[in-house]
Amino acid sequence: MMESIKKLRELTGAGMMDVKKALADAGNDEEKAIALLRERGIVKAAKKADREAKEGLVRFVVDGNRAAMVEVNSETDFVARNSDFQALVEQVAQAALRAGTNNVEELRNFTLDNGETVGNAVAAAAGKIGENLVLNRVAYIDAGEGEHVAGYVHSNGKIGVLVDLLGGTEAQAKDVALHVAAERPQYLNRDEVNAADLEKEREILTNKALNEGKPQQIVDKIVQGQIGKFYEERVLPEQKFVKDNSVTVGQYLGNAQVKRFVRFEVGAQ
């Protein structure tokens, strides 16, 4: 009995009394006792679900031309730096790659090698760690022939990026991932810019110029120049390249083209 208690405590991180009760309830069957402890961990986690989880980590995994990235949130940065939590996030990222999904709910329901779902693994970890943990986001890229996939995670694990580059080199894909992390582009190209947002920006700039007493005949020219700056600040190929601001990202890439980028920042949507 004591050997089983010791073993289960090491495997689950649960307290002695919790392990003893689980073993008793499971008729000393260790596997059933572990299942009970996980279930009870899930109950504890559910009670914490009303607490906000705004800290956490981003992790990515690249395997050839496939890549996945996840964001898992915790309540405190202290837990985000916990080795058990970091191992959980790594496990979830690996699962996301195998699941091949961009859908959080699909990933939650994906079954791990040990037979439990990703969602249950996160909930069990929440019970063990003692904080509300949330699988917040997932991204998956399956690149085609002639494409390069790269990822970047800032050293503190709070910002992560995936990039799918058509043409060019793997080094360029990695450079763009670093750029996206630092410069926060909002759009892949001008066509992605919301027409209503652009019109609102144009209206604001027009009224600003008129309020400053600019002559009507030059207002349109002024606004057009400022709209150009709007694109330069938000559209990836038009941004100044972070590693060499004498060129834009588009100029740096030449004939290569970013097909997709994903940027996660912990606590931001």
UniProtKB/Swiss-Prot annotation:
<dbReference type="InterPro" id="IPR036402">
    <property type="entry name" value="EF-Ts_dimer_sf"/>
</dbReference>
<comment type="similarity">
    <text>Belongs to the EF-Ts family.</text>
</comment>
<dbReference type="InterPro" id="IPR018101">
    <property type="entry name" value="Transl_elong_Ts_CS"/>
</dbReference>
<keyword id="KW-0963">Cytoplasm</keyword>
<keyword id="KW-0251">Elongation factor</keyword>
<dbReference type="InterPro" id="IPR009060">
    <property type="entry name" value="UBA-like_sf"/>
</dbReference>
<dbReference type="GO" id="GO:0003746">
    <property type="term" value="F:translation elongation factor activity"/>
</dbReference>
<dbReference type="InterPro" id="IPR014039">
    <property type="entry name" value="Transl_elong_EFTs/EF1B_dimer"/>
</dbReference>
<feature type="region of interest" description="Involved in Mg(2+) ion dislocation from EF-Tu">
    <location>
        <begin position="76"/>
        <end position="79"/>
    </location>
</feature>
<dbReference type="InterPro" id="IPR001816">
    <property type="entry name" value="Transl_elong_EFTs/EF1B"/>
</dbReference>
<keyword id="KW-0648">Protein biosynthesis</keyword>
<protein>
    <recommendedName>
        <fullName>Elongation factor Ts</fullName>
    </recommendedName>
</protein>
<dbReference type="Pfam" id="PF00889">
    <property type="entry name" value="EF_TS"/>
</dbReference>
<comment type="function">
    <text>Associates with the EF-Tu.GDP complex and induces the exchange of GDP to GTP. It remains bound to the aminoacyl-tRNA.EF-Tu.GTP complex up to the GTP hydrolysis stage on the ribosome.</text>
</comment>
<dbReference type="GO" id="GO:0005737">
    <property type="term" value="C:cytoplasm"/>
</dbReference>
